[in-house]
Curated annotation (Swiss-Prot):
It is a single-pass membrane protein. The keyword Membrane applies. It is found in: Cytoplasm; Nucleus membrane. It comes from the Eukaryota. This is UPF0742 protein SPAC977.02. GO terms for cellular component: cytoplasm; endomembrane system; nuclear membrane. The chain crosses the membrane at residues 38-60. Belongs to the UPF0742 family. The keyword Phosphoprotein does not apply. Pfam families: Pombe_5TM.
Length: 146
């Protein structure tokens, strides 16, 4: 975990020095947009990997956490980076995905929720992992109790 924190700090430092990153609303600019420099693309990819590793750490090292909470946490980590996904992924509605597994439903529900809440304030400067857990402690039971 200490190594992940060091890498995250270095990535944040590089991204802070990029004026382009500060002026982009990532909800509308996927990772593959050519305006982003190669360095910034690598930084964003590394940050995504860091969050996924952090979540894997929670999943494997905290046996007392329920599987529902761990799955939901992983969904939130993936969803936190939904700004890098193609637009069509974010526009799927929950009602049209009945054939998906519970885990995918949770992820897509989170994508809808995060996209709605983040589109109001457009503040993407906070990258602390604790931001991922705000508002997700009580997931709707209809999506995970089946």
């Amino acid at each position: 975990m200490a190594l992940l924190k060091k890498i995250n700090t270095q990535v944040n430092r590089i991204m802070k020095n990029s004026s382009l990153v500060q002026n982009i609303c990532f909800d509308r600019v996927p990772l593959f947009i050519p305006r982003l420099s190669l360095t910034v693309k690598y930084c964003l990819a590394v940050k995504l990997l860091i969050y996924l590793l952090y979540c894997w750490y929670i999943y494997s090292e905290v046996p007392s956490a329920s599987s529902k909470f761990r799955s939901f946490t992983f969904g939130c980590v993936v969803v936190y980076h939904n700004k890098f996904f193609p637009r069509f992924i974010r526009t799927h509605s929950i009602n049209s995905i009945r054939t998906f597994s519970k885990f995918q439903v949770i992820i897509l529900f989170s994508i809808e929720k995060v996209t709605r809440s983040e589109s109001k304030n457009h503040s993407y400067s906070k990258t602390d992992i604790s931001d991922l857990h705000q508002g997700y402690n009580n997931p709707p039971s209809r999506f995970i109790s089946r």
